């Protein structure tokens, strides 16, 4: 995968095998996976970490193979999904940390550039999520109000 804001190449990664049904060695059922996902979400675990916990602790290679639904879909069906997608939330938290750092270290030009690139990614993601109707049309990112959006 190519990198976005550099001339260098990105890291290559392995691709997952194409499967349509769960492997026979996986003995856990769809109802069990759903309850585990909901319990982990109530404990404050993010969706990416839920997938890793399912893989490492419970031997579930892919939640979608067993339940037929993604982790976020399971959360939406049980009305506990977050309003803002997780990748956008993580970028906003990163931008808030950079802004806090730059308020103390005003001459740090490298992190000024990093903040600029991060906020560009945020705007690009917001545009995509508006097109996909995940975010409402009137939603927009403002650095001044971003901290209130995240803590809600």
Curated annotation (Swiss-Prot):
SMART domains: Ribosomal_S13_N (SM01386), Ribosomal_S15 (SM01387). One of its GO terms (cellular component) is cytosolic small ribosomal subunit. Residues 1-23 are annotated as: Disordered. GO terms for biological process: translation. The keyword Transmembrane does not apply. Gene3D superfamilies: 4.10.860.130, S15/NS1, RNA-binding (1.10.287.10). One of its GO terms (molecular function) is structural constituent of ribosome. InterPro entries: Ribosomal_uS15 (IPR000589), Ribosomal_uS15_arc_euk (IPR023029), Ribosomal_uS15_N (IPR012606), uS15_NS1_RNA-bd_sf (IPR009068). Residues 1-11 have a biased composition (Basic residues). Keywords: Ribonucleoprotein, Ribosomal protein. NCBIfam families: PRK08561.1 (NF006331). Belongs to the universal ribosomal protein uS15 family. Part of the 30S ribosomal subunit. This is Small ribosomal subunit protein uS15. It comes from Methanosarcina acetivorans (strain ATCC 35395 / DSM 2834 / JCM 12185 / C2A).
């Amino acid at each position: 995968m190519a990198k976005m804001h550099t001339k260098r190449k990105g890291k290559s990664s392995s691709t997952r095998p194409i499967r349509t049904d769960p492997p026979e060695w996986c003995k856990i059922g769809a109802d069990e996976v759903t309850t585990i996902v909901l319990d982990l979400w109530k404990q404050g675990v993010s969706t990416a970490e839920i997938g890793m916990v399912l893989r490492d602790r419970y031997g579930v290679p892919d939640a979608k193979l067993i339940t037929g639904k993604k982790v976020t879909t399971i959360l939406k069906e049980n009305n506990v999904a977050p309003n803002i997608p997780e990748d956008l939330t993580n970028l906003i938290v990163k931008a808030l940390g950079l802004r806090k750092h730059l308020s103390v270290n005003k001459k740090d030009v490298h992190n000024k550039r990093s903040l600029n690139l991060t906020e560009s990614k945020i705007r690009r993601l917001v545009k995509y999520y508006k097109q996909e109707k995940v975010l409402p049309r009137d939603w927009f990112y403002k650095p001044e109000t971003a901290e209130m959006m995240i803590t809600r």
